[in-house]
């Protein structure tokens, strides 16, 4: 990545594009696999679409960042909880890949209540010549079998199959907001509003409760769990965030189940900022460990913060995402925008941070140069392999030609979900029902 992020030239391309969107088409999860060769998206209709990267050729260097549809399958269906008279949406809340161990790929997907483990594999041969079955798979009468045949494998068109290998259900009373694969690759955790459960991939009927903040009296409830993630290298360590802006680092060696809500990382409250809207805006919507350093990144409504695990009382870095909205928090509360859950991601070297905003804008912050840039993902100003231009939001009355007034922002167009290729400067951005790929300019 170039040092001057303001002058960076970025190409973009569409991956998924609908001229008209239904509620089911809205993308709700985006995730690269560990190599970056596959990119998975989930939507509110319960579908998972997997894209595969085009093989690079010497004659088509400009296509090095292009992805095509690899597999599509229905992960979750709408359900109804008859005991509680509640509808369970099919919406995919999170997708997490497992490291590839063989020719097949494995991923976790979850809706509000159920986590599923999927196997995605290729098949280019089919068996023929069964003795007890005919060519259509029907059983043959043994009395008609006069010769013994040896089954053989015949070539066939490549078929990508997605099959559910495990279904992890009936363990969450509240809505699941996070799943995270442990670094031992044998376990993973799922977090809802009040509890975090630890699962073994081989056991579907039992999980262990490793965090519980539910009070004895629900009238005393003051916060909920908003996000959780395992440490990328230490299998005993995980972190979770809360709606009060607190971050709790937990060690499973110290306690089998973390109870209560003690503060671990939290910025002191500003006595001058005690309004109800500002308290809501301090709720953390995403938390991520860095890959290279002992840092944690959090996203609240207005900012992205980076925390050093050795400094509990303040973040070491704070980046303003859309500070121009601070004066509009009351109206954003009235239209429920203040409850939007924005995600944040690191690049492969943890040197650049990316997160979304409104009007289909997304922000990038270079931690080394302290430069930032606002870019837009939209069909109106973007064509495949076009170069994106930085955008600026004007707060005052006067604005330049290339600026947009804060009063003109479209709050129905929001980028909540983003993903960064693990080793290259290729990013995926979900803008409502459209998926965009961006990459550094190819010379």
Curated annotation (Swiss-Prot):
Primary localization: cytoplasm
A molecular-function term among this protein's GO annotations: protein phosphatase regulator activity
Tissue specificity of this protein: Brain.
Coiled coil: none
Keyword annotations of the record: Cytoplasm, Cytoskeleton, Membrane, Phosphoprotein, Repeat, WD repeat
Residue numbers of Phosphothreonine PTMs: 298
Cell location: Cytoplasm; Cytoplasm, Cytoskeleton; Membrane
Entry-linked Gene3D superfamilies: YVTN repeat-like/Quinoprotein amine dehydrogenase (2.130.10.10)
UniProt-listed InterPro entries: PP2A_PR55, PP2A_PR55_CS, WD40/YVTN_repeat-like_dom_sf, WD40_repeat_dom_sf, WD40_rpt
GO cellular component: cytoskeleton; cytosol; membrane; protein phosphatase type 2A complex
WD repeats: 22-61, 87-128, 171-209, 220-260, 279-317, 334-375, 410-442
Modification Phosphoserine, positions: 275
PROSITE patterns per record: PR55_1, PR55_2, WD_REPEATS_1
SMART domains xrefs: WD40
Oligomer and partners: PP2A consists of a common heterodimeric core enzyme, composed of a 36 kDa catalytic subunit (subunit C) and a 65 kDa constant regulatory subunit (PR65 or subunit A), that associates with a variety of regulatory subunits. Proteins that associate with the core dimer include three families of regulatory subunits B (the R2/B/PR55/B55, R3/B''/PR72/PR130/PR59 and R5/B'/B56 families), the 48 kDa variable regulatory subunit, viral proteins, and cell signaling molecules. Interacts with TOMM22. Interacts with IER5 (via N- and C-terminal regions).
Record's function text: The B regulatory subunit might modulate substrate selectivity and catalytic activity, and might also direct the localization of the catalytic enzyme to a particular subcellular compartment.
Stated family: Belongs to the phosphatase 2A regulatory subunit B family.
Protein name in the entry: Serine/threonine-protein phosphatase 2A 55 kDa regulatory subunit B beta isoform
Highest classification ranks of the organism: Eukaryota, Metazoa, Chordata, Craniata, Vertebrata
């Amino acid at each position: 990545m170039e040092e001057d992020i303001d002058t960076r030239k970025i190409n973009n391309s569409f991956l998924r594009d609908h001229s008209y969107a239904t509620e089911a088409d809205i993308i709700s999860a985006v995730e690269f696999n560990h190599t970056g060769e596959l990119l998975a998206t989930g939507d509110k209709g319960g579908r998972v679409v997997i894209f595969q990267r085009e093989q690079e050729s010497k004659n088509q260097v400009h296509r090095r960042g292009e992805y095509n549809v690899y597999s599509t399958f229905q992960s979750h269906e709408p359900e109804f909880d008859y005991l509680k008279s509640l509808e369970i949406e099919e919406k995919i809340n999170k997708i997490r890949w497992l490291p590839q161990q063989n020719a097949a790929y494995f991923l976790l997907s979850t809706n509000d209540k159920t986590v599923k483990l999927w196997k995605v594999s290729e098949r280019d041969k089919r068996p023929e010549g069964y003795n007890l079955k005919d060519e259509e798979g029907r059983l043959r009468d043994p009395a008609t079998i006069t010769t013994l045949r040896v089954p053989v494998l015949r070539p066939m068109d490549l078929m990508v199959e997605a099959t559910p290998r495990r279904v992890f259900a009936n363990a969450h009373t509240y809505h699941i907001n996070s799943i995270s694969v442990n670094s031992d690759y044998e376990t993973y955790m799922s977090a809802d509003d009040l509890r975090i459960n630890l699962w073994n991939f081989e056991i579907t009927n039992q999980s262990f409760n490793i965090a519980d903040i539910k009070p004895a009296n629900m009238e005393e409830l003051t916060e909920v769990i908003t996000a959780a993630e395992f440490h990328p290298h230490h299998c005993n360590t995980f972190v979770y965030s809360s709606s009060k802006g607190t971050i709790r680092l937990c060690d499973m060696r110290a306690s089998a189940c973390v109870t209560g809500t003690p503060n671990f990382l939290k910025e002191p409250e500003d006595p001058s900022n005690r309004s109800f809207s500002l308290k809501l805006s301090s709720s953390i919507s995403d938390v991520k460990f860095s890959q290279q350093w002992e840092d944690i990144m959090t996203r609240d409504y207005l900012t992205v913060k980076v925390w050093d695990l050795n400094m509990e009382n303040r973040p070491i870095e704070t980046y303003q995402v859309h500070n121009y909205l601070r004066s509009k928090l009351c109206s954003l509360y009235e239209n429920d925008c203040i409850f939007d859950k924005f995600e944040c991601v690191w690049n492969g070297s943890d040197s650049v941070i990316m997160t979304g905003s409104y009007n289909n804008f997304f922000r990038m912050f270079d931690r080394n140069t302290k430069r930032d840039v606002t870019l837009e993902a939209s069909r109106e100003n973007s064509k495949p392999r076009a170069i994106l231009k930085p955008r600026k939001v004007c707060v005052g009355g006067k604005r330049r030609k290339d600026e947009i007034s804060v009063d003109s922002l479209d709050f129905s167009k929001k980028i909540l979900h983003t993903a960064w290729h693990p080793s290259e400067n290729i990013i995926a951005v979900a803008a409502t029902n459209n998926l965009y790929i961006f990459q550094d300019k190819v010379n």
